[in-house]
Regions:
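Alpha-helical transmembrane segments of multi-pass small-molecule/ion transporters
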Residues: 1-313
Length: 313
C-alpha cells in the first residue's frame, strides 16, 4: 500500500499546496485562472505534441481503446440522464449537469499526472486519446442536451457551435500536429524541441496546483444529496462501467492500456465543469460536486490503484 501512496501522495501534496497558498493569501484565487489558462493553452498542448510526435503511429492509433473509452463514457452519460430525468424529474439542463459531472474526467489536470506516475511516459498518448473522445463526442452531446429544452438553438446548431469553438482549441492542435509529426516522422530542430519540452514539463505540477487553488471558497452546504450522487457516479460508477466494457464487450489485451482506461474513468470531473454549466445556472452545484469529488478521489484513486496492482484486471 505504501508504494501506491508513493504514487498518489505527490499529486495530492501539490493540490493541498495550491489550496493552502491560495487560502493564506500568497496567491489570489483569480491567479488560478491565469495559471489554468497557461496550462490549457500552452503547457498541455506542448506536452501532447511532445508525447505524440515522439511516439510511433502504431502506438498512437488504438481504436479498441478509443471505442471502449467512448462506450463507457456514453453508457455513464446515458445512465445519468435516465436517473436524473426519469427518477428525479430534473430539467434537461440539470440532467446534463449530472451527466457531465459523472462522465467527463479531469484527464489533463489530474489524470495525466496520475497515469504518468503510475504507468510511465505513455500517459501523454492516453491523454490525447481521452481528449479526442471528450472533445468530439461527450461534451458536444451534453451541451446540445442542456440547450434542448430551451429551444433557442437546434441540437445541430449547438453541436456545430461546439465544434467551431474547438478549432480555436490549442489542445486539439497539439494532438493534430503531434500526430502529423509522428506520421511523417518529422523531427523538430534540437533547440526548438528543448523549448517545447520545457513548456511540456510545466504541465504536471502547475495543473495540480491550479486544482487546489480553485477549490478555495467552494462549499457543499445545502447540496449534499445531489453532490454525493454526482461524485459517486464519477468516482465509482464510471470506472465500474469501464471495467464491465473491458470484461464483456471490448477487451483490451495490453495491460497498460487496460489500466489506463480504468484509471482515466476513476478521475474526478474536469476543472471547467462549473464554467460549462454556468450558462444554465448550475455552477454552484457543479463547483460543490467538483470539490467533493476531488477530495474523495484521494481514497477512491488509491483503492483503484490497489485493485489494479493486486488483482488481475
Amino acid at each position: 500500500m505504501f508504494d501506491i501512496l508513493a504514487i498518489t501522495a505527490p499529486i495530492y501534496v501539490a493540490i493541498v499546496l495550491g489550496y493552502g497558498l491560495t487560502r493564506w493569501g500568497v496567491f489570489q484565487k483569480s491567479d488560478m485562472r491565469g495559471f489554468g489558462t497557461f496550462v490549457i493553452k500552452v503547457s498541455l498542448p506542448a506536452m501532447l505534441f511532445n508525447a505524440l510526435s515522439n511516439t510511433q503511429v502504431k502506438e498512437i492509433f488504438q481504436p479498441i481503446y478509443l471505442a471502449a473509452y467512448a462506450l463507457a463514457s456514453l453508457a455513464t452519460l446515458a445512465l445519468a440522464l435516465v436517473w436524473s430525468m426519469k427518477f428525479k424529474r430534473e430539467s434537461f439542463s440539470l440532467s446534463s449537469c449530472y451527466a457531465m459531472g459523472m462522465s467527463c474526467p479531469n484527464s489533463g489536470f489530474v489524470g495525466y499526472p496520475v497515469v504518468l506516475l503510475s504507468l510511465g511516459p505513455f500517459a501523454g498518448v492516453v491523454l490525447a486519446l481521452n481528449m479526442i473522445v471528450e472533445l468530439f463526442l461527450i461534451i458536444p452531446i451534453l451541451m446540445a442536451w442542456a440547450d434542448a429544452q430551451e429551444g433557442k438553438n437546434s441540437a445541430v446548431q449547438v453541436v456545430w457551435q461546439t465544434f467551431n469553438g474547438m478549432l480555436k482549441n490549442t489542445l486539439l492542435w497539439g494532438i493534430v500536429l503531434g500526430f502529423l509529426f509522428s506520421w511523417f516522422e518529422i523531427q523538430l530542430p534540437q533547440s526548438l524541441n528543448r523549448s517545447v519540452t520545457l513548456f511540456a514539463q510545466a504541465s504536471g505540477a502547475l495543473s495540480l496546483f491550479v486544482i487546489g487553488g480553485s477549490l478555495v471558497g467552494l462549499s457543499v452546504q445545502g447540496m449534499g444529496p445531489r453532490v454525493s450522487q454526482i461524485a459517486f457516479g464519477k468516482l465509482i460508477l464510471h470506472p465500474l462501467i469501464m471495467l464491465a466494457v473491458l470484461l464483456w464487450v471490448l477487451p483490451i489485451s495490453d495491460p497498460v492500456l487496460r489500466a489506463a482506461a480504468i484509471l482515466s474513468c476513476a478521475m474526478p470531473m474536469f476543472g471547467i465543469y462549473p464554467i460549462l454549466t454556468q450558462k444554465h445556472g448550475h455552477e454552484g452545484l457543479s463547483a460543490a460536486a467538483l470539490l467533493a469529488a476531488t477530495m474523495a478521489s484521494f481514497f477512491s484513486l488509491n483503492g483503484v490503484l490497489w485493485l489494479l496492482k493486486t488483482q488481475s484486471i
